[in-house]
């Protein structure tokens, strides 16, 4: 509970931040979060009797990356890397989920996600010899090919509990393959609510994903992410998903709602990058009320979340009554700068060292 209270406190501090100086003070206090990860990964390495060379080979990462984890407490940058660590170190299911939930703030292994289903099967049947991550990759690619050949299947859609119970009953690779193919429809639909929300924001700009990415000079990996999300029900990269929300001018509440649809935890100010993103989004909405109006226009007819829908309608009623904007188009024209551009400027002012992030802004 202490950790949870601290997280809430830090999140609240960021929401009240009025300058980059105050933000930097919060960032400087985040060292314990990275210290926890450093202690955790070093304990695992010691328990498994590995050196850096063996760890980098097992986790399919460079030696420099592994050294940064163990010496500096640098966090892995995406969920796939956490999967590499879990499989490389042959963690059991409980340990694997702790790794994902506590340190990655990613969802636990989710049986209704095809990649996770493969991971769950490999964990239950770790090969006696060889590379567990390679086994996972080969089985995943084979199943993706088989699913394309098989089609959606005739099986009725299963809920998460049903699919996970039946997954655990599959003993052979052949049985597992047959189960996945027969339930291909359930796997393809696992993230459809998330894709629906993202599409609402993109369509509001009168563009498809390709046009949105092209017009805003963004990374085409967003297009690939959306394709994988819709066609294969593939779990998106957490930071990339958050940054897509930023580029779509979503509020903090909307980004966190989107994360919940991806079965992920809300944004956490204990993570330095997420802390900066939270500051940028909160400040942008505070300085420019047009962002609130824009997102309210988009979500006013969104029935999947009645609470969010009502909040958006209340915002619109407030602004129309005040007569601040004559019509919707005037509001949208007023937004000359995306929050993504604003975030990029803040990161540059803070001399953010990880250049990879700028690819997505």
Task: State what each model feature region is.
Residues 57-77, 102-104, 214-236, 240, ...:
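Recognition helix of helix-turn-helix/homeodomain-like DNA-binding domains
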Residues 25, 95-149, 254-333, 339:
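Short amphipathic recognition helices of helix-turn-helix/homeodomain-type DNA-binding modules
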Residues 79-95, 239-254:
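DNA major-groove recognition helix of helix-turn-helix/homeodomain DNA-binding modules
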Residues 51-58, 208-217, 244:
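Short alpha-helical "recognition helix" segments of helix-turn-helix
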Residues 50-51, 80, 207, 239:
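Residue-level signal for the short linker/turn that defines the boundary of a DNA-recognition helix
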Residues 6-50, 139-211:
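A short, Lys/Arg-rich alpha-helix, primarily the initiator
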Residues 53, 64, 94, 223-224, ...:
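Key DNA-contact positions within bacterial/archaeal DNA-binding proteins
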